[in-house]
């Protein structure tokens, strides 16, 4: 079977780190689109899954590209495509499916501990308490109707699932260079910026690499969906052949 074809909706406003990071972490054929342009695929057909990246925008801002992106994502969900949102993408998926995104009134940034429930395919092989880099001042305040919270910490919900849709608030794709660049770009007190920079160490990055497993797990989920669709297609084809044979026998 060929590698899965994934639509990557890049919402990162020309940040050079974002495409590099997702190309490195996603072992798939990627079709990349600049959502801010706005540039979106003409159709959801031809893709096996969708990834929505982070962004410096807020989901609730009145920017002309945000709602078309949400509408396209809803179409992909309705078509049964597995979706993964990261940070802003996590929030957009929640918003698109009827959840609530709100300002936190504070900033979570740096390598932080997060806890997951231990029974999700997304976190298979990840310790229930794990480390990941975080940077956000908005949160999914309420997950979409019918969704399950998969992970959280003392700041916010950090992962949810609804059917074939997964969102993670943390950044499993970040390398140390990205973590430093993002931190230096924040409008925060100098002392806090320095504390976060001091925490971007090889040891903390090594600990956070465990969180990258969510990409492998999500792609494995995509493959399972593909295989199920192929099996279903074969079964439907066999049923049609049986029906045609029965019709032919009746004609005789």
Protein language model features and the residues they cover:
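Active-site phosphate/pyrophosphate- and oxyanion-stabilizing loops and adjacent acidic/basic residues
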Residues: 20-24, 91, 120, 137-138
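Cysteine-nucleophile active-site neighborhood
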Residues: 53-120
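Short glycine-/acidic-enriched loop or helix-start segments at secondary-structure transitions
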Residues: 18-19, 42, 61-63, 93-96, ...
């Amino acid at each position: 079977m060929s590698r899965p074809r994934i639509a990557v909706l890049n919402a990162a406003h020309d940040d050079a780190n974002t495409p590099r990071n997702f190309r490195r972490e996603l072992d798939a054929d990627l079709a990349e689109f600049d959502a801010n342009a706005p540039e979106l695929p003409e159709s959801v057909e031809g893709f096996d899954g969708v990834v929505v990246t982070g962004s410096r925008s807020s989901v609730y801002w009145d920017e002309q590209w945000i709602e078309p992106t949400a509408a396209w994502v809803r179409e992909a969900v309705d078509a049964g495509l597995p979706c993964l949102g990261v940070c802003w993408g996590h929030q957009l998926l929640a918003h698109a499916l009827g959840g609530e995104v709100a300002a936190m009134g504070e900033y979570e940034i740096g390598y932080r501990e997060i806890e997951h429930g231990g029974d999700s395919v997304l976190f298979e092989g990840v310790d229930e308490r794990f480390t990941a880099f975080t940077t956000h001042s908005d949160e999914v305040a309420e997950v979409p109707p019918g969704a399950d919270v998969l992970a959280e910490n003392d700041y916010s919900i950090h992962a949810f699932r609804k059917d074939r849709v997964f969102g993670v608030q943390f950044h499993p794709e970040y390398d140390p260079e990205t973590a430093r660049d993002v931190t230096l770009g924040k409008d925060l007190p100098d002392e806090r910026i320095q504390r976060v920079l001091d925490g971007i160490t090889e040891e903390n990055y090594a600990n956070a690499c465990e969180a990258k497993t969510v990409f492998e797990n999500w792609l494995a989920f995509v493959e399972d969906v593909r295989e199920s669709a192929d099996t279903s297609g074969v079964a439907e084809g066999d049923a049609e052949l049986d029906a045609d044979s029965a019709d032919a026998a009746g004609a005789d």
